[in-house]
A protein has these predicted regions:
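Conserved catalytic-core segment of NTP-binding enzymes
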Residues: 3-9, 25, 29-33, 40-41, ...
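Residues immediately N-terminal to the Walker A/P-loop in ABC ATPase nucleotide-binding domains
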Residues: 12
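P-loop (Walker A) phosphate-binding loop of NTP-binding proteins
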Residues: 22
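N-terminal phosphate/diphosphate-binding loop that engages ATP/GTP or pyrophosphate donors
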Residues: 36-106
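Flexible beta-alpha connector loops of hexameric P-loop NTPases
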Residues: 84, 112-121, 167-175
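ATP-hydrolysis module of ASCE/P-loop NTPase motor domains
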Residues: 92-133
Length: 230
């Protein structure tokens, strides 16, 4: 089998890769294959599912790993992100102390308020994804050399990927603005990130993939990855 073109290899070697497309086109299968390929080449890979029904675990033939990364195969870690789990982890990163998190975020009224904030779930899950790209081992090397994100279906993927830049541009200076800027910078990195698109050879999936490609270039300023026609 011939090796892939250099531009394809370069995209598949990027540190932060997002796989997106219309629901039912095989997006999760492609994300799992990309992550498995990298892990078999010796990379330390984290595969993140965004609030999904453990499809990555099913494709890989392993047990689900909700909220916390777990090594499921050699060099391959899996984590299904949920809004509640991402909120807890992100809050603990800020508050540092679990007792303080429990006092504030487990309060019934606070929990109700948080549920009422539009798109907060997407922002905290993007924050969790960004955080995992910054983790290091004791020797200072990256804990994960690849982070592959199985994004939600097209409309939700647009929100998931665009929200950090929107928040960074509109909120006043403070902790939230700094965090959103870091998330947006990761998505917009011309060398570290890319967006892979998956479609079926049918009109609606292809149109949604093209729409997402245009949105990525004009709104997200995110590099294009590879296109997969299942």
């Amino acid at each position: 089998m011939s090796s892939p073109p250099a531009v394809v290899r370069e995209r598949l070697d990027r540190a932060f890769q997002v796989v997106a497309g219309k629901g039912g086109v095989g997006r999760t299968l492609v994300a799992s294959a990309i992550a498995l390929r990298a892990s078999q080449r010796g990379e330390r890979v984290l595969l993140l599912e965004v609030n999904a029904p453990d499809s990555c675990a099913r494709f890989l033939g392993v047990a689900p790993a909700p909220d916390e990364p777990r090594e499921v195969l050699p060099n391959l870690w899996l984590c299904r992100m949920t809004p509640a789990g991402a909120m807890k982890e992100y809050a603990l990163l800020i508050l540092r102390f679990k007792a303080l998190y429990t006092l504030v975020f487990e309060n019934r009224l606070v929990k109700y308020l948080l549920r009422s904030i539009p798109s907060l779930a997407e922002l905290t899950m993007m924050g969790k994804a960004w955080y995992h790209t910054t983790e290091t081992l004791d020797d200072g090397s990256p804990r994960y050399t690849r982070v592959v994100v199985d994004a939600p279906a097209t409309g939700h993927a647009m929100t998931f990927l665009s929200l950090s830049r929107i928040v960074a541009d509109v909120v006043p200076p403070g902790v939230l603005k700094v965090a959103a800027e870091k998330m947006a910078a990761l998505i917009e990195s011309p060398i570290d990130s890319c967006l892979h698109l998956v479609a079926l050879p049918e009109e609606m999936p292809v149109n949604e993939a093209l729409e997402l490609a245009v949105f990525s270039a004009k709104k997200l300023h995110m590099a294009t990855g590879i296109g997969v026609m299942n």
